[in-house]
Design a protein with these regions (language model features):
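Anionic group-binding determinants
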Residues: 1-116
């Protein structure tokens, strides 16, 4: 017996900043003129609004996430409820996790070896 597996995310949102998907692509070659080798993505589940940030290292995702979050919350008047990412060590950093917990943001991880 075979079963079709849905490629649709299991978690869906209905309002802006209810759920943000984040992932890192790279390393890209050649690197940018500024020395960036990675791309961080931030995608809103409800609106499909997407933003990217260029990174020199994967560890820069936390600082870029903070910039993204502050800007989007200020502009929309809404607060982020949930962040969905893979199990990359850059997302499991204790400083990143503490930041999310202090703001009441739930961090959900994808199953290993699955596409965001």
């Amino acid at each position: 017996m075979t079963t079709n597996i849905s490629r649709e995310p299991t978690i869906q949102a209905t309002t802006f900043l209810e759920l943000i998907y984040s992932d890192i692509c790279g390393p890209i070659a050649p690197q940018t003129r500024g020395g960036n080798r990675y791309i961080a993505t931030f995608i809103d589940s409800a609106t499909k609004w997407a933003e990217i940030s260029l990174l020199k290292t994967k560890n820069e995702v936390f600082s870029e996430f903070k910039v993204f979050l502050k800007r989007e919350q200020t502009q929309s008047g809404k607060t982020l409820k949930r962040l969905y990412s893979d199990h990359g060590t850059e997302y499991k950093d204790s400083e990143f996790e503490d930041y999310l917990k202090k703001r009441g943001i739930i961090h959900t991880y994808s199953a290993p070896y699955t596409h965001q």
